[in-house]
Amino acid sequence: RVLLAPLVAALLFQPRASARLVAGVVYLVAAVSDLIDCEIARRRGEITNFVKLVDPIADKLLLAATLIPFWIVTESDPQLGGLPIFGGIPLWTLLVFFGREILVTVLRTRAARSGTVVPAMPIGKYKAAAQSVFSGSMIAWLALRTAAAEKDWSGGTYQAWESFHGWFTTITLILALILTV
C-alpha cells in the first residue's frame, strides 16, 4: 500500500477519466490487499508489534493519497466536485481526518518508545473502513464526473446515477467524519 499510494495520487492529478479510473482500480487493489494481508497475518498468528505500528501508517498514506488530490482537483475545477451538501470536500474535513490521524500516530509513537504497543480499537477499524469506502467512492465520483465532462453526458440515466452516487459518497463522508471524531 505504501508503494501504491503515490501512484493513486499521481493518477488522480491526471485530467483524463481513464487515468482516474485506473487510480480507482489501483486504490481497490491496495484496499483489498490490506484486508487480505491482515486476515492472513491473523490466521497465522503473525501480527507483530511492527505490523501493529506500521499498518495504520500505510492506511494514513493511502488516505492522504486520495483526499489531498481530490481536494486540490475539485478546488481547481469545482464542476468536478458537485457532491450534495458539500460540493467538493471542505478543507475542514481534511483537517478533521488528518488532525485525528496525526494525534493518534503521535500518541502511538510515544507509547511505542516506552515499550507499549497500542493496537487499533474496533471503532478505529470501523472508522478506517468508512474512510476506505468513502475514498473509493470519491475516486469513482471523480472519474465519473471527468468522463461526463469529456463525453458530454447529460441524459436521464447519467443524471440518476450521478444523483445516487453523489448521495452515496456524501453519506459515506458524513459517516467517516462521525467515526473519526
For the regions a language model picked out, list residue spans one by one.
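Cytosolic, membrane-interface loops and tails of multi-pass inner-membrane proteins
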Residues: 36-52, 110-120
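A feature for the membrane-embedded catalytic helix bundles of lipid/isoprenoid biosynthetic enzymes
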Residues: 2-5, 9, 17, 22-28, ...
